[in-house]
């Protein structure tokens, strides 16, 4: 599943933008990108550029502000109780995502990495950008790794960059999603309670 606005209530890059004093500017770009109005790669690079000069200590402060979506931890526990694996794919950043994953007990994580020199963010990414295509590829790879048929996979997300994985999964769910994503998804949840996903999964 996606992390920002899905597993958690916030958009991590917006929180980082607030720390950099450019919160409103970053949030506007995020909103347009998630609606599919902007090229995601270009929008991400633009927002990351605004974070240049931030100290790496910002990641601990940012994680402290993160709250899990209602039902998120219960969904992970419920999945594990059935012997299922849970992975997250995010256009956000490993520096915060890894802390979220550890707190939630999630099995796999794919996210972006921010470049830092001498403890300061450079405003650039340290590796290839996680795109809608790479989210889909990662879902396919994890299914193969776990020996799970695609018909038995689940994908949950809210943004335009989640559409390919949502459509490819055996059960694809738009969660409190942007209109474009909701229209493209086989299933949709409009209430901020991730445990509702389990009802869909078990019914589908």
Where are these regions (language model features)?
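C-terminal cap/substrate-recognition subdomain and adjoining C-terminal extension
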Residues: 61-204
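Short, surface-exposed acidic
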Residues: 26-27, 56-59, 150
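A structural signal for alpha-helix termini and helix-coil/disorder junctions
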Residues: 22, 35, 50-54, 65, ...
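Hydrophobic alpha-helical segments
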Residues: 16, 23, 28, 50-53, ...
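Short, basic/glycine-rich phosphate-binding loops at helix/coil junctions
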Residues: 43-59, 118-122
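Conserved active-site and cofactor/substrate-binding residues in soluble primary-metabolism enzymes
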Residues: 11, 21-24, 38, 54, ...
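Short, flexible segments with low predicted structural confidence
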Residues: 14-15, 32, 44, 50-51, ...
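Active-site neighborhood of HAD-like aspartate-dependent phosphohydrolases
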Residues: 1-41, 45-46
């Amino acid at each position: 599943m996606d992390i920002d606005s899905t597993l958690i209530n916030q958009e991590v890059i917006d929180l980082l933008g607030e720390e950099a004093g450019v919160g409103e500017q970053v949030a506007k770009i995020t909103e347009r990108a998630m609606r599919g109005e902007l090229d995601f790669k270009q929008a991400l690079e633009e927002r990351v550029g605004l974070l240049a000069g931030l100290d790496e200590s910002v990641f601990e402060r940012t994680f402290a502000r993160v709250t899990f979506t209602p039902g998120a931890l219960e969904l992970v526990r419920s999945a594990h109780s059935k012997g299922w694996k849970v992975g997250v794919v995010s256009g956000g950043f490993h520096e915060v995502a890894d802390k979220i994953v550890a707190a939630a007990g999630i099995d796999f994580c794919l996210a972006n990495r921010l470049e830092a020199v001498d403890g300061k963010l450079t405003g650039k990414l340290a590796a290839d950008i996680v795109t809608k295509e790479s989210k889909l590829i990662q879902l396919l790879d994890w299914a193969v790794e776990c020996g799970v048929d695609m018909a038995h996979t689940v994908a949950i997300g809210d943004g335009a960059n989640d559409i390919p994985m949502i459509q490819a999964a055996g059960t694809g769910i738009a969660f409190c999603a942007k209109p474009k994503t909701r229209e493209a998804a086989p299933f949709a949840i409009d209430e901020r309670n991730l445990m509702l996903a389990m009802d869909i999964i078990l019914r589908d």
